[in-house]
Amino acid sequence: MNTPNPRVAKLADQIRVVVAETLERRVKDPRLGFVTITDVRLTGDSRDATLFWTAMGTDKEIAGTEAALESAKGMLRSTVGKRLKLRYAPTLTFVRDATPETAKSIEDALARAAASDAEIARRSQGAMPAGEADPYRHSDEEE
């Protein structure tokens, strides 16, 4: 993937800040839980922004948060356009970020591997190698 245009990267970061502040201060939807905007990806022409988000809670609460984000999308778009003084405010698409779930599965796999290593180490204590104590030939020995 090419490195993004520095202006587009800066604009994406500004959009993330504006949306996060607006969600915290202006959106009063009770379905909106504790939401974190983790990343914003902006197209090269700055017309479409994909906002990745995470939220804490049960599946039902997260579904409510998703619905609240969708219903606030228009207000958030106009706020982004006004605060950043953009001629064209980008369309906002909210996508739930799967990073926390992925990190959890990786942590679980690492914990299983560590437990397996500990079990192997426990079993190998006091074990003797198969064959002779020193299986290598030495030059001082007769053949």
UniProtKB/Swiss-Prot annotation:
Matching SUPFAM superfamilies: Ribosome-binding factor A, RbfA
Annotated stretches, region: Disordered: 117-143
Chief location bin: cytoplasm
Record key words, sorted: Cytoplasm, Ribosome biogenesis
Transmembrane residue ranges: none
Alphabetized GO MF terms: ribosomal small subunit binding
Alphabetical list of PANTHER family matching this protein: RIBOSOME-BINDING FACTOR A, CHLOROPLASTIC-RELATED (PTHR33515:SF1)
Complex and partners: Monomer. Binds 30S ribosomal subunits, but not 50S ribosomal subunits or 70S ribosomes.
Family: Belongs to the RbfA family.
Function noted in UniProt: One of several proteins that assist in the late maturation steps of the functional core of the 30S ribosomal subunit. Associates with free 30S ribosomal subunits (but not with 30S subunits that are part of 70S ribosomes or polysomes). Required for efficient processing of 16S rRNA. May interact with the 5'-terminal helix region of 16S rRNA.
Protein name as annotated: Ribosome-binding factor A
Source species taxonomy: Bacteria, Bacillati, Actinomycetota, Actinomycetes, Propionibacteriales
Name of the gene this protein is made from: rbfA
